[in-house]
Curated annotation (Swiss-Prot):
GO terms for molecular function: catalase activity; heme binding; metal ion binding. Pfam families: peroxidase. Bifunctional enzyme with both catalase and broad-spectrum peroxidase activity. The record marks 86 as: Transition state stabilizer. InterPro entries: Catalase_peroxidase, Haem_peroxidase, Haem_peroxidase_sf, Peroxidases_AS, Peroxidases_heam-ligand_BS. NCBIfam families: cat_per_HPI, PRK15061.1. The lineage of its organism: Eukaryota, Fungi, Dikarya, Ascomycota, Pezizomycotina. This is Catalase-peroxidase. It comes from Aspergillus terreus (strain NIH 2624 / FGSC A1156). It catalyses: H2O2 + AH2 = A + 2 H2O; 2 H2O2 = O2 + 2 H2O. Its EC number is 1.11.1.21.
Amino acid sequence: MGESKCPVNFAGGGTRNKDWWPDQLRLNILRQHTSASNPLDADFDYAAAFNSLDYNALKKDLEALMTDSQDWWPADFGHYGGLFIRMAWHSAGTYRVFDGRGGAGQGQQRFAPLNSWPDNASLDKARRLLWPIKQKYGNKISWADLMILAGNVALESMGFKPFGFSGGRADTWEADESVYWGGEKTWFPKGNDVRYPNDDIYTRDLENPLAASHMGLIYVNPEGPNGNPDPKAAARDIRVTFGRMAMNDEETVALIAGGHSFGKTHGASSGDHCGPEPEAAGLEAQGLGWQSKYGSGSGRDAITSGLEVTWTKTPTRWSTNFLEYLFAFDWELTKSPAGANQWVAKNADAIIPDAFDPSKKHKPQMLTTDLALRYDPAYEKIARRFLENPDQFADAFARAWFKLTHRDMGPRARYVGPEVPSEVLIWQDPIPAVNHPLVDASDIASLKQAILNSGVDRSKFVSTAWAAASTFRGGDKRGGANGARIRLAPQRDWEVNNQPWLKESLAALEKIQSSFNGSRSDRKKISLADLIVLAGCAAVESAAQEAGHAVSVPFTPGRMDASQEETDVESFSHMEPVADGFRNYSTAPTRRRAEHYLVDKAQMLTLSAPEMTALVGGLRALNANYDGSAHGVFTSRPGYLTNDFFVNLLDMGTTWKPTDASGELYEGADRRTGSKKWTATRVDLVFGSHAELRAIAEVYGSSDGERKFVKDFVAAWNKVMNLDRFDLKRENVPARL
């Protein structure tokens, strides 16, 4: 019996729930990266381990590896630099701005699907080349950090000075299932029939939040859109994909021209000679894929992309040759040995070295996407400036490379290591350092009283604190309450925030802040960021106490206020939520329902299913819908922290029906009399409809459930309020996320 015909009568095999009900709301993404999958001790502190590393020795070992060519995978030109640059680039290059997912921060290139994407062919060999070094230094260096550092050392070993490097990327131990890579069922060179609404390569719009033109690519098709060798059309795709990775035109040109100053592509023959990708390969392959039967299968016979291009005559040294050749030659379309579209310089001498035969030379060659830098007017202007100003080119590439490889690391408070650059960059979302004594317990108590006596309904303080803190994204560690950017553009103008409660609560808090800070002789101050969180905590505490539950909501000062000048408006605009089910906000869904967006948001906030459930129920009880609506506010006591949401949702005396064909809004009526009782959204009703969520709701809706609910809500609230406090040691927030 062939392997594909093997029986599946084993644990976890057979037909699964998702096969029967493919549209079922899945909560698996809320159960990832926990201690159940992590082999390291619970108290393992990766940042501390990294700081104990002999960093210089590690870099020397990496530098030695660059020219230590192995027979089983020989180095092009005797140097692995190009391979390791590509590995680092592709590790970081999956990042996208709309949801903060992807990127290098978790070492996900080791796992499916990334380890088997067509665009990552042969990077399995790069990681195996690194294994002896990883084995030597053990847990002091994560795979996530090592892959990026190897790229930096590769640049250094070829004469380029990087901008810097930070460690701190803790490994995960399973494939991240939270990332939407696209709806396609095929990979590149197909694999784009869902992400684009039409086939017109000159007008099509890429689906959000994607940042690649095909399933299985990091960026775009190097042969041109859908294989069409049109540099101008390629420029359009490049601008979209690089833009969605947070790169502007200058950074894009710098990265392409700088990255292609090194190494080569591999297309000795057709990919038909290659075996299956790592995830489909046999056990004997030991995690390696694409094993080729063409010639030696490696070296001069290597097959990766199917393109066969060496860009410069100095592929192991930094130079401006790429830009020089780009503009010096006229280019004509040709084919690689594998039949792929590429370009060769007309009437040019053979000046490009062969990767393995020193007696051979080749004519300069380029990819369609390379020529986009010449034939797109905006890119051309930048590329010519870089050619005429090599120092500007080097600086731009160094900065863009640092941004590429560190974009998903979050604030500088997470940076560790001896090569962290001192310059503060706008894309790091800088926040001023604390420069004054912090408030103590007595101050906090008096400030709480001032907040509660301000005359502002406490639900508005809850809404404001949630609006500020819930911008956090676990993928790229951006957002959160620190910085008080809720008061700045663009956050204050987002539809979900541009409501009367924000203006009223901020005005009251600014008045309290001014009074407190102006009255002190001991230099103590409280930031608006701290005060926003404290107001939310005071409101929750008061709402619980008035409902009969004596609780203390934790609060730790130390946040500071960012300025508008320290806030990149365009960058933050990508973080505007499409939906926030926690406060019953949703724009028109596309191919997903509101409850799916809720789970998406919960995963960004690193919440578990019980935490998500407690927060939704509590925020409804506290009357914190973004627009003040009564949807899901299943209580006669709005503003009190009770379990009424769950009690009334689970009440069999209520029947529900949609208000229209969209199925977005529902009315609940008394089963006996038919009189209207409640209104609800899909997000509200899913806690009674979805079997797993209902099971949690039943715990909180039971006669003995309210005290536990209040306790769990306060814990989850505290977690969200502190998700961005990387300056604190937190036990209640998973450090490995």
